[in-house]
């Protein structure tokens, strides 16, 4: 459950508070939204995302920062570089980056999308 006022957003999460996360008409994992907009209409999205092992293309449609909480995720960038995220790792990607994500172990992240 998320509470959002003009001054802050606060969330308490249970398993039932996640919903399908849909990209390009396909559900890829589940999301719990903490915040869905910034001040004065600015793009600012914050949430938790979780997934069982799977692989899928993921275009970064805005700047995104990821803090890995559980499991392992391998992000293959179009440049050929691989970014592996495990609990405690933080990575930030710029808008327009094309990637393929491979969840190798059940994975959970906190994410912030801006731009």
Predicted regions and their residues:
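A short, N-terminal "cap"/entry segment at the start of jelly-roll beta-barrel domains
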Residues: 1-43
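Conserved short histidine dyad/triad with adjacent acidic residue
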Residues: 43-60, 94-95
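Short, conserved beta-strand element in jelly-roll/cupin
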Residues: 51, 60-75
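Short hydrophobic/aromatic-rich beta-strand segments that constitute the beta-sheet cores
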Residues: 58, 75, 109-111
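Short acidic-glycine-tyrosine-enriched beta hairpin
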Residues: 79-95
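Ligand-binding loop in jelly-roll beta-barrel domains
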Residues: 89, 95-115
């Amino acid at each position: 459950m998320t509470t959002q006022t003009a001054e802050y957003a606060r969330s308490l999460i249970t398993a039932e508070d996640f919903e399908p996360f849909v990209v390009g008409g396909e559900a890829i994992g589940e999301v719990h939204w903490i915040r869905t907009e910034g001040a004065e209409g600015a793009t600012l999205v914050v949430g938790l995302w979780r997934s069982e092992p799977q692989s899928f293309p993921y275009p970064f449609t805005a700047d995104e920062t990821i803090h890995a909480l559980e499991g392992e995720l391998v992000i293959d960038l179009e440049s050929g570089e691989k970014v592996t995220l495990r609990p405690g790792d933080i990575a930030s990607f710029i808008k327009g980056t094309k990637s393929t994500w491979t969840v190798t172990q059940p994975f959970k992240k906190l994410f912030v999308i801006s731009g």
